[in-house]
Amino acid sequence: SLAFVSLPAGWFGDWHPAPQRQFVLLLSGTFEIETGDGESRKISAGSVLLVEDTQGQGHRTRVVSEQAVQVAIVPSSPSK
């Protein structure tokens, strides 16, 4: 089911895999995501990510904007 999440300015989520394959729609703010292979990208409002790293180290995320990040999370398939 659709979930809305707010992450405050300065928030940091250490390494974690995604709970399931899902789309993340960035509604406001900017965050930086780093993958296990060392790739890092800044993602801003209006972007849509397909998160598929459900196994292993996963990714880490940091809010880099001065305002909170608002995201909508949409599973790509029903949970089992």
Which residues does each predicted region cover?
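Conserved short histidine dyad/triad with adjacent acidic residue
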Residues: S1-A18, E52-G56, P75-S79
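Short, conserved beta-strand element in jelly-roll/cupin
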Residues: S6-P8, P17-E32
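Short histidine-centered beta-strand/loop micro-motifs
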Residues: F12-A18, E34-T35, R41-K42, R62-V63
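Short loop/turn positions at the edges of beta-strands in beta-sheet-rich folds
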Residues: P19, L27, D37, D53-Q55, ...
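Active-site scaffold segments
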Residues: F23-L27, G46-E52, A72-I73
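Short acidic-glycine-tyrosine-enriched beta hairpin
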Residues: G36-T54
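Double-stranded beta-helix
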Residues: Q57-K80
